[in-house]
Amino acid sequence: MRILFVCSLLLLSGCSHMANDSWSGQDKAQHFIASAMLSAAGNEYSQHQGMSRDRSAMFGLMFSVSLGASKELWDSRPEGSGWSWKDLAWDVAGASTGYTVWQLTRH
C-alpha cells in the first residue's frame, strides 16, 4: 500500500520547473553510465552483505533509480535546470543495464 501511495504521489504531484531537453546528448550518457555503475555496485554490495539474489537485485535497481530520482528532484528547484522525465528514463535504462551486466558477470 505504501508503494502505491508513493508512486501516486510522484505521478500526480505537479512540478513547477520542467527541463526543456532532448533525448540525446552528453547529459543522457552520464545519467546512463552513472546509473549502470550504481546498480551494479548496489547489487555487489548487497550480495556481500548476505542478501539473496532476488533481494540484491531489487536493492541495486532501487538504489540506482532512487538516486536518479533524487537528482531530478534537486534539479526541479527554482535555481536548478528543471525536472526531466528524459533523464529519469535514461537512469532507469542504465540501472537495468547495470543489473544485466552484473548478472552476466556472476555466471
Swiss-Prot record:
Q: Which domain of life is it from?
A: Bacteria
InterPro entries, per database record: DUF2279_periplasmic_lipo, UCP034456
Name of the protein in question: Uncharacterized protein YfiM
Specify the species: Escherichia coli (strain K12)
